[in-house]
């Protein structure tokens, strides 16, 4: 937003404005990976970025940076979709960042399995969700890894440590610990047990989630192997400031370092996080990617320069 940019200029660039080479505007609804939603953005209601980009240009001009280019990222597939932004005096110097489309090029280092998956995605196969251990929303492909986390989140139930009229049904948490849940949640317990989800985990929100024995063992192993890659991690409860966030590890999340490392080194594409921009479904109908072979980066750039 323009307000955020003004704060950044004041704090980091006020005395060094000549070093600002450009400002990247990343559309939170269409970009892949972590999403930069503001407090006023509604996740389920995508907005055109035009007015926000004009606001950014106005802030730059007010700070003597009127010629600094704005780089538009997120949802950029072809330049013909952005004609209203090019040679537009309200926006000024502008550039475009392509993040999703180059993934299916000959030079792209992702695995062949990952490339083939991208080629067959539908519009609803990329979802914005809150599973990242960073605490930010992120956009990723809805594979079995993401669906597992959705299942954990959607089946979580409240509990009480004491038996009450509302929380009347006992459920064994461990050898020496019994919790109590509501009668209406017993159906969820039965459903999860039929799926093999017989282990329980307490979340930081004082709810119970269901995991298989193997899933819980793997998550405990991942927490034990935490290397502190984040300043604060929702999954492991690590904090670089105090050693712990003071909360329970949240198994509705995952070890992001492990998952990105695995899939980045030709690991299983179904059991790891696959960040993706919302427009990945366009691969299926883009003639450049339906010739039986992957185009080179040069071919992609030549196509982009034609506006296609």
Give the location of each predicted region:
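Glycine-rich beta-to-alpha transition loops that act as phosphate-gripper elements at the mouths
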Residues: 1-4, 67-81
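Active-site-facing alpha/beta catalytic cores
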Residues: 1-29
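Generic structural signal for well-ordered alpha-helices
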Residues: 5-9, 53-57, 82
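Conserved active-site-proximal phosphate/metal-binding subdomains
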Residues: 20, 28-46, 59-67, 79-81, ...
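Short secondary-structure boundary/capping elements
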Residues: 48-52
């Amino acid at each position: 937003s323009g307000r955020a940019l003004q704060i950044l200029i004041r704090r980091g660039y006020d005395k060094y404005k000549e070093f600002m080479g450009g400002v990247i505007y990343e559309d939170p609804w269409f970009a892949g990976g972590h999403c930069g939603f503001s407090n006023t953005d509604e996740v389920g209601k995508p907005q055109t970025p035009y007015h926000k980009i004009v606001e950014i240009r106005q802030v730059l001009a007010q700070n003597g940076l009127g010629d600094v280019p704005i780089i538009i990222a997120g949802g950029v597939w072809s330049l013909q979709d952005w004609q209203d932004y090019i040679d537009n005096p309200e926006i000024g110097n502008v550039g475009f960042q392509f993040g999703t489309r180059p993934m299916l090029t000959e030079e792209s280092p992702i695995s062949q399995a990952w490339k083939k998956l991208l080629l067959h995605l539908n519009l609803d196969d990329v979802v914005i969700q809150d599973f990242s251990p960073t605490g930010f929303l992120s956009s990723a492909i809805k594979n079995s890894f993401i669906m597992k986390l959705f299942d954990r989140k959607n089946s979580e139930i409240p509990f009480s440590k004491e038996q009450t009229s509302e929380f009347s049904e006992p459920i064994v948490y461990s050898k020496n610990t019994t919790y109590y849940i509501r009668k209406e949640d017993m159906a969820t317990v039965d459903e999860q047990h039929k799926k093999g989800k017989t282990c329980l985990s307490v979340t930081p929100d004082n709810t119970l989630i269901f995991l298989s024995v193997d899933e819980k063992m793997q998550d405990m192993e991942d927490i034990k192997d935490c290397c502190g890659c984040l300043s604060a991690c929702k999954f492991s409860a690590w904090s670089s400031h105090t050693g712990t966030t003071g909360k329970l590890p949240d198994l509705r999340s995952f070890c992001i370092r492990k998952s990105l490392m695995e899939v980045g080194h030709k690991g299983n594409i179904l059991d790891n996080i696959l960040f993706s921009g919302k427009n990945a479904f366009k691969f299926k109908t883009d003639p450049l990617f339906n010739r039986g072979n992957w185009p080179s980066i040069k071919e992609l750039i030549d196509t982009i320069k034609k506006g296609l």
